[in-house]
A protein has these predicted regions:
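A compositional/biophysical signature of low hydrophobicity enriched in polar/charged and small residues
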Residues: 1-106
Length: 106
C-alpha cells in the first residue's frame, strides 16, 4: 500500500481544539479517519517548527490521500501538505526506467 507523509499546521481554531482535547484524543481521531479510508497510521508526532504535526500513513492510493487532505483542511482546524513516500525498492524500480530528456540549453 502506498505511504504518505502528512505535514500539518494548526490554525488558531485547531490550536484551541488541541488545548481542549489534548494530543491523544486527536491521535485517535486521525487513526479512525485513516482506518475508515482503508489505511493505517504508522506514526504521528507533534513537533516544534514550521509544521505542528507529522503523520505517516499507508493508504489505498492517491485519491484516498487527496480526500483526507481536502476534508481535513476544509474543516478549518488545520492546513495539510501531503508528500508521497517511496521505499528503497520503489526508487530502484524508478532508476531502471529509461527517460528521454534534454536539459534546457543543452
Amino acid at each position: 500500500m502506498p505511504k504518505y507523509l502528512f505535514k500539518v499546521k494548526l490554525t488558531p481554531d485547531g490550536l484551541k481544539g488541541l488545548l481542549k482535547e489534548g494530543g491523544s484524543a486527536r491521535r485517535d481521531v486521525v487513526g479512525r479517519m485513516v482506518e475508515g479510508l482503508g489505511g493505517r497510521v504508522e506514526t504521528m508526532y507533534w513537533a516544534f517548527g514550521e509544521d505542528d504535526v507529522y503523520v505517516t500513513a499507508e493508504l489505498p492510493g492517491n485519491t484516498s490521500a487527496a480526500a483526507l487532505g481536502m476534508v481535513v483542511s476544509a474543516a478549518g482546524g488545520v492546513r495539510t501538505s501531503t508528500v508521497v513516500l517511496l521505499s528503497a525498492e520503489e526508487v530502484d524500480e524508478a532508476v531502471r526506467h529509461q527517460v528521454d530528456y534534454r536539459a534546457p540549453g543543452a
